[in-house]
């Protein structure tokens, strides 16, 4: 055994931020990429095969980061990109300069997530100012991250 210390950099092994899926296999409440944005499908309908061509799938989806509504119409046999979406919970340490200071279960800190805007941001700030121990849910897809919800951490008394 050697006494040398080894440090290993973590990497994503070159994995893609999306994967292909046939239109007909997409489902409501699933995720899809429309206009290069990761979206959650809120409504979908299929039109019958016409005289020329394939059955079409009409998708209505909401951008998971901006909340904007996007629509797409595509043949059911075509492939669409589906984003790899991850949800992680972090303990909130601080809110500083519009950014959240977070800690994961391993004790690693993360300071690059923007504080949410609007009602969620206001209620998060209020709960934090009241001294509550908070867990924040962060959703990440296609290189973007955002806080989508928070809850009071369970007490371990």
From Swiss-Prot:
- Protein's name according to its UniProt entry: Eukaryotic translation initiation factor 5A-1
Record PTM text = Lys-51 undergoes hypusination, a unique post-translational modification that consists in the addition of a butylamino group from spermidine to lysine side chain, leading to the formation of the unusual amino acid hypusine. eIF-5As are the only known proteins to undergo this modification, which is essential for their function.
Modification sites for Phosphothreonine: 7, 10
Q: What gene is it encoded by?
A: HYP2
Summarize the impact of residue 116 to L. Answer: Temperature-sensitive growth phenotype. Lethal
Q: Which residues carry this modification: N-acetylserine?
A: 2
The lineage, from the top, is:
Eukaryota, Fungi, Dikarya, Ascomycota, Saccharomycotina
Glycyl lysine isopeptide (Lys-Gly) (interchain with G-Cter in ubiquitin) crosslink - at what positions?
A: 86
GO CC, alphabetical: cytoplasm; cytosol; mitochondrion; perinuclear region of cytoplasm
Highest taxon of the lineage: Eukaryota
GO MF terms on file? Answer: ribosome binding; RNA binding; translation elongation factor activity; translation initiation factor activity
Which positions bear Phosphoserine?
A: 2, 74
